[in-house]
Amino acid sequence: MARVKRAVNAHKKRRTVLKASKGYRGQRSRLYRKAKEQQLHSLGYAYRDRRARKGEFRKLWISRINAAARANDITYNRLIQGLKAADVDVDRKNLADIAISDPAAFTALVEVARSGLPEDVNVPSGEAA
């Protein structure tokens, strides 16, 4: 049986890993074993952070909506509660975009939310009967 020589495949595999690890620091960009370990970790971090990014954007949108809502004398949770009660179906991404790009439209949405809230909710906490 003929001997199988794998030098070409092995070098190709190593070259691919080292090419992908370009930009890493120290041995992790020069030594195959270290580069391979770092690449495995990097892929795991990328997978994790693609999912974490979605939550981070949601936090950003909520912060923007809350800032714009407070400028209109209503809190974020009252705004969302009022919009749901008024059957306004707008997601947080679009609501944040409206708050930044079109303040007049956002103010109109705030008024719709206020009309959707029950009467006792609109009274400030210090003046409740």
Swiss-Prot record:
One of its GO terms (cellular component) is ribosome. The keyword Coiled coil does not apply. PROSITE patterns: RIBOSOMAL_L20 (PS00937). One of its GO terms (molecular function) is rRNA binding. GO terms for biological process: ribosomal large subunit assembly; translation. It comes from the Bacteria. InterPro entries: Ribosomal_bL20, RIBOSOMAL_L20_CS, Ribosomal_protein_bL20_C. Keywords: Ribonucleoprotein, Ribosomal protein, RNA-binding, rRNA-binding. Belongs to the bacterial ribosomal protein bL20 family. Binds directly to 23S ribosomal RNA and is necessary for the in vitro assembly process of the 50S ribosomal subunit. It is not involved in the protein synthesizing functions of that subunit. This is Large ribosomal subunit protein bL20. The gene is rplT.
